[in-house]
Amino acid sequence: MTALSPRRTFSGTALKTIACITMLVDHIGASCIEAGILTPGLDAGTLSQDALSAYPLYRLDMVLRFTGRLAFPLFCFLLVEGFVHTHNVKGYLGRLVLFGLLSEVPFDLAFFRTPFDFSAQNVYWTLALGVLAMAGLKRFEKENGLPGWQGLMWAGGCAALALAVNTDYHAIGVLIICTLYLTRADRKRQCLAGALLFLFELTAPLAFVLVWFYNGQRGACSPLQKKAFYWFYPVHLLVLAGITNLML
C-alpha cells in the first residue's frame, strides 16, 4: 500500500456509514418509487411510457438512484480491506452467508413484492463470492505477488456462479472486488481501476474520491455498531417493503 497522506480523514467506519446512507437513498428509489409507484402504474396503464419522463417522481427517482450508485463501490473496497485484515476468513465468509440467508426474503419483498423470487439474489451473496474469490487468489498467489492461474480460474468460477444465480451486480461485482484486491498495494492504481470498471454507472466512479481519502484506519466501531452494520441491510429492506406495501 502506498503511503497515506495525513490529510486523509475518512476511517473505515466513516466510509461504511456513507455506504449505508447512500444505499438507503438508492433503495428508497428502487423500492418505494419504482416498485411501489412507477412499475405498478405502467402495468396498470395509469401511467404511460411517454409521460414517464415528465413525471415528478421519475425525476426524484433518478436523483435517488444516482446518489445511491456510490454505495456498492464503497462496500467492495471495504470488503477487500476486511478480507486483508481479518484473522478469520472462514468467520468473515460465514457472516456474509448468514446475512445473505437472512436478507433474501426482505430483498424479494422490497423489490419484487413477494417473499420468494428466485430470479435475483441479494448483494450479500455477491460479497460472499467476492471473499471466496479473494481467498482463491491469495491461496495461489505467486512468490512475486502476482496471481497464479489457479487463483484466476477460481475467481472466474466465483464470478460465473454469481452470474448463474444472478446475485446483485452478478459477475461484474465479483470481478471488481478481485480487481480492487489485486491493486490494493497502490491506492492510486486501485482507485483508477475501480473508477474505470464502474463507468457503466454514471456516478459510481465518484465513490473512489472518498476511497482516495481513506486514512487506513478502522475508526471507532463498538461490537454493537459492527453488528448494526450487518443488520442494517435486511432491516432497512423490511421497512421499505412495508412502506411500499402500504402504498399499493
Residue ranges: model-predicted function:
Residues 1-248:
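Alpha-helical transmembrane segments and their immediate juxtamembrane cytosolic regions
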